[in-house]
């Protein structure tokens, strides 16, 4: 997972914090961990970038981060992920910027304790790795910017390639930015158990959004995305798991940032709504407080609440009555109904000569009973995770 937090000079510009993160995929072996670290809103092929910058960067930078992730359920440690990543941005001219990222994930542990229809509760061992890279070129023109990106990710049984193009239009007073983007992804799934070989999945993504400076101290951003995919969505490692071969996703994200001159701090609020054709609806609420401190330090505590309904074809354990072979069915608890809280804190320090460092700690706790407006899916064990990410950066 990669993310950036950049400020673009003007007071209103520095209030926005744009995170582009890969969304979760419940058929990828790495997804039990990555689903917790992703926002499920970005187009594939878009690298971490200050999406509302209205001019080419005049300085380059390089960032190195290391993520340590672990999750568990009662009586069982599950997935461990160790993930170094590298991000860089270089201005090639006054109007052209290149940027890219590389990430390596080493994954080990056990799959979720889901209910296997043939043998009861199961937590099979998982060992995998993922390597991924992204590259993007952005050209700044008179009152607009055009970006082209490419992305590739490889696991032992999963290959993904994607590309995107985006178009941003700036108002004359530079207080408003319109954003439009289109992306496409081509995935191939070849599980080690041979259930399928080189099974395809193709996806098209569309984004439209606006960022508006409301005043010198406040800014709002709202994006909608729509995705349409066709291909293999079932989990080959779960017995009888059968999912539709088409999936569409609609998502709406709104962020609001308010600067307070007294404490020289920024309140960051966000809300995301997502609905997919599998029948699941999710809502995510997040609040963060960014507080600069003396001597180049800053701290940013945050709290996120996430809730989702179950997919139409999710069945609660034990093995459901009336099951018909060949019908859509899953016991994957990631498609169950639940709620989750994620408290986190980020600490950063700037040094001389363009150096900086940061550390983020987060804890995730998931329970069925925390579903908003419902009781959640019965028979699902509580799920917990924690991750620590440390980084160092140099601008030049």
What is the meaning of each model-derived region?
Residues 82-86, 131-135, 161-165, 202-208, ...:
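Hydrophobic, lipid-facing positions within transmembrane beta-strands of outer-membrane proteins
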Residues 117-123, 225-257, 273-283, 296-390:
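Outer membrane beta-barrel transmembrane domains
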Residues 96-98, 143-148, 173-178, 216-222, ...:
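Repeated loop/turn-to-beta-strand initiation elements of outer-membrane beta-barrel proteins
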Residues 73-79, 111-117, 151, 158-166, ...:
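Outer-membrane beta-barrel translocator domains and adjoining extracellular loop/strand segments
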Residues 62-64, 100-102, 148, 178-182, ...:
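Membrane-embedded beta-strand positions of outer-membrane beta-barrel proteins
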Residues 167, 217, 382-396:
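Outer-membrane beta-barrel "beta-signal"
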